[in-house]
Amino acid sequence: MAPQMEKVSEELILPSSPTPQSLKCYKISHLDQLLLTCHIPFILFYPNPLDSNLDPAQTSQHLKQSLSKVLTHFYPLAGRINVNSSVDCNDSGVPFVEARVQAQLSQAIQNVVELEKLDQYLPSAAYPGGKIEVNEDVPLAVKISFFECGGTAIGVNLSHKIADVLSLATFLNAWTATCRGETEIVLPNFDLAARHFPPVDNTPSPELVPDENVVMKRFVFDKEKIGALRAQASSASEEKNFSRVQLVVAYIWKHVIDVTRAKYGAKNKFVVVQAVNLRSRMNPPLPHYAMGNIATLLFAAVDAEWDKDFPDLIGPLRTSLEKTEDDHNHELLKGMTCLYELEPQELLSFTSWCRLGFYDLDFGWGKPLSACTTTFPKRNAALLMDTRSGDGVEAWLPMAEDEMAMLPVELLSLVDSDFSK
């Protein structure tokens, strides 16, 4: 049972300085236009800082003031999105919700079997089809929840229409640094995305249509499990330098293929799609603080007859990453078209949030106990995150409920509902 929560207040946080007239209209890029209309949900859980004298009211006020300051630099986030074309940077403000949770932090996060219970720590729904209406024109919303023990949860919804996860990391790093009182922060660049990928008039905005009967599980691959997978892959190949993400994706892909073959038979190729950051792949490279959806989709595939173990899948994954394409707009368009044409059971897509430093986000009262997302309503769309120790991988995997039950025990044994570890 989810902890009882009481909403205390909601207000709009405005930038501390008005946005100049010259910056009132922010044109989104063509890559932004091709992205789904939804939000990136992200939650940070913090234990009670033993050396802090701040009460909830002071903490909330401190967060609001620092958010107001940082919004001066991230001014589109305080505006309102015009349908698939631009952001009206009118300083309408960021919704900021404050709530009280009638539970200890440890009680709330030690046994989260149903991951949708995490949704209550978000300011609003991240995806359409839920019980709460999605505010599609609001770029950013924030919620802080105070537990009885003094712990906190900070939930953020950032519109995927104007930002990718690296943009989220850039914003959160700037906000936490400002909250700590630092005067030098990494300033965002909102010009580069549209300059390199100019918007195209009348581009339709893809809608996210939730799948039915989808269940999501959080699989935790700790250091020991990663080591075992690496040893198995090394024994089957002369290559030894496998990344954590490659090992986990190949391992999951192999079992998804097995489930698909058992349920549907082998008809077409099995495809994996990975979202890849373009900033470092551009010529010249773009800085990491360039805001927007500066990413593309890369594909790897094996024939329907493929029937080997997971190390054999690492090669196709690596080969797809080595591909280069000058026309990234065309590359992404081709990828989006392919996504719509494939049958869901033939496809595994994944995004990696690893190595983005989310466990270093310190508002001034210490690092988080847990950094997580929440459920996603599309089957076979995996999200990978670092474990708190930094040497493991969390795989958040949504599947059709009956297909999830068909996964082998060796994979299902990695399901972990304890977010306090």
Curated annotation (Swiss-Prot):
Gene that this sequence comes from: ACT
Reported uses of this protein in biotechnology and industry: The strictosidine aglycone-producing AJM7-DeltaHYS yeast strain expressing pathway genes of the VOM module, RsGS, SBE (GsSBE, RsSBE1 or RsSBE2), RsPNAE, RsVS and RsVH, accumulates vomilenine. Additionnal expression of pathway genes of the AJM module, RsVR, RsDHVR, AAE (RsAAE1 or RsAAE2) and RsNNMT, leads to the production of ajmaline. Ajmaline is an anti-arrhythmic alkaloid commercially used as an efficient drug for the treatment of arrhythmic heart disorder.
Its job: Acetyltransferase involved in the biosynthesis of ajmaline-type monoterpenoid indole alkaloids (MIAs) natural products, important plant-derived pharmaceuticals used in the therapy of heart disorders. Catalyzes the conversion of 16-epivellosimine to vinorine, precursor of vomilenine, an intermediate chemical in the biosynthesis of ajmaline. Acts on gardneral, but not on polyneuridine aldehyde or N-methylgardneral.
Which keywords does the record carry? Acyltransferase, Alkaloid metabolism, Transferase
Q: Does the keyword Acyltransferase apply?
A: yes
- Mutagenesis or variant effect for residue 29 to A: 75% reduction of activity
Question: Can you provide one Gene Ontology molecular function annotated for this UniProt record?
Answer: vinorine synthase activity
**EC code(s) of this entry:** 2.3.1.160
Residue positions of the active site: 160, 362
Write down the PANTHER family for this protein, in alphabetical order. Answer: F21J9.9, VINORINE SYNTHASE-LIKE
Temperature dependence of activity: Optimum temperature is 35 degrees Celsius.
Keyword Transcription regulation: yes or no?
Answer: no
What pH-related activity note exists for this entry? Optimum pH is 7.8.
Which reaction(s) does its UniProt entry say it catalyses? 16-epivellosimine + acetyl-CoA = vinorine + CoA
GO BP term, example: alkaloid metabolic process
UniProt similarity note = Belongs to the plant acyltransferase family.
Which species does the entry assign this protein to? Rauvolfia serpentina (Serpentine wood)
Q: How does it assemble?
A: Monomer.
* Pathway per the UniProt entry: Alkaloid biosynthesis; ajmaline biosynthesis
Q: According to the UniProt record, what happens if one changes residue 160 to A?
A: Total loss of activity
What is the protein's name according to its record?
Answer: Vinorine synthase
One Pfam family for this entry, by name?
Answer: Transferase
Tissue range of expression? Mainly expressed in roots and, to a lower level, in leaves.
